[in-house]
């Protein structure tokens, strides 16, 4: 699962902070919304044509702000807590697969008091491991011995969630309340 909180303010302000390090000014935080979802290194390279080294530095600057401030600049989507509760009551097992580093994902779940709904939380590694959404989903499946997964479904609000599910031969549900589109 991914797409539980609206991270727009936190992510875009952290991207803005990283860009400022390079003397780049963003005119409007909404211009930075494409950074929501894909790996940061890719986004800095793709959208600002950063070299690998510049993208690495930008990611470090991003995380510098995110760790203390940006992590809390997001909000739970309306009705999400009730939805999670209902899913658990119906017997579903929920696991989180996010592009955010695992350490940040766990802090966000704790902050919103929803960690108890998830039996497993996985994200990218601060060391660059589990780089793509497909890598993260594969890690979730392997760590939980889910080798035969006809009842496993990836729910997400970005194309990267759906692509990652397909890479792992999972069914997926794309939701439109977040930052995805058709």
Regions from the language model: what does each represent?
Residues 25, 115-119, 147:
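Conserved H-loop
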Residues 83-109:
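Substrate-recognition element of Asp-dependent hydrolases with the DxDx(T/V) motif
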Residues 115-130:
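A short, structured active-site edge motif that brings together acidic residues
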Residues 18-19, 39-52, 108, 140-142:
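Helix-loop "lid/cap" segments that line or gate small-molecule binding pockets
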Residues 153-182:
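Acidic, Mg2+-coordinating phosphoryl-transfer loop and its flanking beta/alpha structural elements
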Residues 133-162:
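Conserved Lys-Pro-Asp/Glu-containing loop-to-beta segment of HAD-superfamily phosphomonoesterases
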Residues 1-34, 48:
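Active-site neighborhood of HAD-like aspartate-dependent phosphohydrolases
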Residues 45-82, 90-92:
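Metal-dependent phosphoesterase signature
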